[in-house]
Amino acid sequence: MSDLPGIVVTGASGRMGQMLMKTVLASGKARLVGAVERPGSDWVGRDAGAAMGGAAVGVTVTDDPLAAFAQAQAVIDFTAPEATVQFAELAAQARAVHVIGTTGLEPAHLERLAWAAHHAVIVRAGNMSLGVNLLTRLTQKVAEALDEDWDIEVVEAHHRMKVDAPSGTALMLGEAAARGRGVDLAQARVSGRDGITGPRAPGSIGFSAIRGGDIVGEHDVIFAAAGERITLRHVATDRAIFARGALKAALWGQDRRPGQYDMMDVLGL
């Protein structure tokens, strides 16, 4: 068992953090060696398993990420942008693979991740599921095949607690559509519409976001032309798909050269 890669989960008390820890513990492919929470969290100092309402697992939740990362081969991180860039720098110091599922990252955050990737492996994706990554590849292929007579819209739905929009997955799909079209998403993107907007701009890629209830994640990519429409859709019903994908990425990253990778690399797509 000690030969299995050691994994640290950040944001341990969150829904994804707990799902990630449970997935690692049940996998038989890795060991949970650390759980990180913010200073002041009532989880700090408790056994991670007991804090989740189960049996003790021998891992104490800590607010010292570097100490945790130093004993790990990989860090899985679904937290917030500012925390993620700090974790990236610490994971690079520890030479641990850093798997990032955090969304809402801005250009300044990405610059700091690029620095960290000179020293360690970073696997970052807006979505870790196999299905969504296949959808991303399909979106690019369809966008390549269709001309600008086909309008492209990305519609996503998530639970009421999600704080960023459009989702990281929606942006990933939009980037795929833009690549297929040979355009810059920053120039083509239209996010939401309200009031008198005028006719749709040719070649634009639209985004719409829905927030409500406990929706895990739904994404539609719509290609609409006069008289016909194609919809590519992915529906997530269980967060475990993201946790399984993240663990797969953490294992894949072992012994890779430092650099930035994504789930397409992990899945060989």
UniProtKB/Swiss-Prot annotation:
(S)-2,3,4,5-tetrahydrodipicolinate binds at H159, G168, T169. Its main location: cytoplasm. InterPro entries: DapB_C, DapB_N, DapB_N_CS, DHDPR_bac, NAD(P)-bd_dom_sf. One of its GO terms (molecular function) is NAD binding. Keywords: Amino-acid biosynthesis, Cytoplasm, Diaminopimelate biosynthesis, Lysine biosynthesis, NAD, NADP, Oxidoreductase. NAD(+) binds at G11, A12, S13, G14, R15, M16, E37, G101, T102, T103, A125, G126, N127, M128. SUPFAM superfamilies: Glyceraldehyde-3-phosphate dehydrogenase-like, C-terminal domain, NAD(P)-binding Rossmann-fold domains. It is found in: Cytoplasm. Pathway: Amino-acid biosynthesis; L-lysine biosynthesis via DAP pathway; (S)-tetrahydrodipicolinate from L-aspartate: step 4/4. It holds the Pfam family DapB_C. It catalyses: (S)-2,3,4,5-tetrahydrodipicolinate + NAD(+) + H2O = (2S,4S)-4-hydroxy-2,3,4,5-tetrahydrodipicolinate + NADH + H(+); (S)-2,3,4,5-tetrahydrodipicolinate + NADP(+) + H2O = (2S,4S)-4-hydroxy-2,3,4,5-tetrahydrodipicolinate + NADPH + H(+). Its EC number is 1.17.1.8. One of its GO terms (cellular component) is cytosol. One of its GO terms (biological process) is diaminopimelate biosynthetic process. The active site is at H158 (proton donor/acceptor), K162 (proton donor). It is an enzyme of class 1 (oxidoreductase). NADP(+) binds at R38. NCBIfam families: dapB. Catalyzes the conversion of 4-hydroxy-tetrahydrodipicolinate (HTPA) to tetrahydrodipicolinate. HAMAP family: DapB. Belongs to the DapB family. This is 4-hydroxy-tetrahydrodipicolinate reductase. It comes from Cereibacter sphaeroides (strain ATCC 17023 / DSM 158 / JCM 6121 / CCUG 31486 / LMG 2827 / NBRC 12203 / NCIMB 8253 / ATH 2.4.1.).
